[in-house]
Design a protein with these regions (language model features):
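Amphipathic, alpha-helical segments enriched in basic
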Residues: 7-10, 20-23, 39, 43-46, ...
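Phosphate-binding glycine-rich loops and adjacent basic patches that engage nucleotide phosphates
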Residues: 25-33, 116-121
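Histidine-centered nuclease catalytic patch
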Residues: 34-66, 75-91, 95
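C-terminal, charged low-complexity interaction regions
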Residues: 124-234
Length: 234
């Protein structure tokens, strides 16, 4: 799950939360913050803590992300300002480390999370978000467009890697990045190209406001659960 840095609020006040949509698209790109699907048709403003639980959160920049209809529907209204800390969030935590995508299938990265946090708290928070969004395609009982699109992205990324192995030119690199940006599913592409640091670095640059503090110089997730400045805070 791509970690993002939205930056400070670009507006002082807005009357309706829908007015935050263009600001969010500019800040983090038109991708679902959770499943990473490209939001071509109907991007929706997502309230991390449900807007029905606290009117003060309805237009608050810190409570807003972008999401697809599938993730918003599955997430529901469970999260509040009180229990928000029971979950990891892509605009606050190292979700690049928290989840892995073997063969393009998302799962909680338990081994890495427990290495960073031996108490198991971070792993539980990641699992809570994973379960809340119903990201595991192996237990879904209903047709899930997120799964279909992710599988398509994995296939395209795999074919792109094969092309890269044959032709490692700057032109090919640029084409791969353009294809990834157009398709979405950042983490799937990062997984497929995990042994190609030149591609990983460019991928991080190409997807808007990806949180670079959570990646090393070769484009791989670092063993941190918070950004360095936050981790240093008592």
């Amino acid at each position: 799950m791509r970690p993002v840095n939205k930056g400070s609020s670009p507006y002082t006040t807005i009357k309706k939360y829908q007015q935050a949509l263009p600001y969010l698209e500019t800040a983090i790109g038109s991708y679902c913050s959770y499943c990473e699907m490209k939001l071509d048709n109907a991007p929706e403003v997502e309230h991390v803590a449900a807007k029905s639980t606290d009117p003060a959160l309805i237009t608050k920049w810190e409570n807003l992300l972008l999401a697809c209809k599938g993730c918003i529907t599955r997430k529901g209204k469970v999260v509040t300002g009180i229990n928000k800390s029971d979950y990891l969030w892509p605009d606050e935590d190292n979700t690049a480390l928290a989840f892995r995508y073997p063969l393009g299938i998302p799962e909680v990265n338990t081994a890495a999370l427990n290495a960073v946090d031996p108490t198991g708290n971070d792993n539980q928070k990641a699992q809570n978000l994973f379960d809340l969004l119903k990201l595991d395609p192996r237990i879904s009982q209903k047709p899930d467009r997120r799964v279909k699109k992710r599988n398509e992205a994995f296939q395209t990324a795999t074919e792109s890697l094969a092309d890269w192995k044959i032709n490692q030119t700057l032109a090919m690199q640029r084409q791969i990045i353009r294809t990834a940006v157009a398709n979405g599913f950042f983490s799937v592409w990062m997984t497929v190209f995990e042994d190609e640091p030149d591609i990983l670095r460019e991928m991080i640059k190409a997807f808007p406001s990806t949180e670079t503090a959570f990646f090393d110089d070769e484009g791989r997730p670092v063993m941190l659960n918070q950004k360095p400045a936050l981790a240093a805070t008592p």
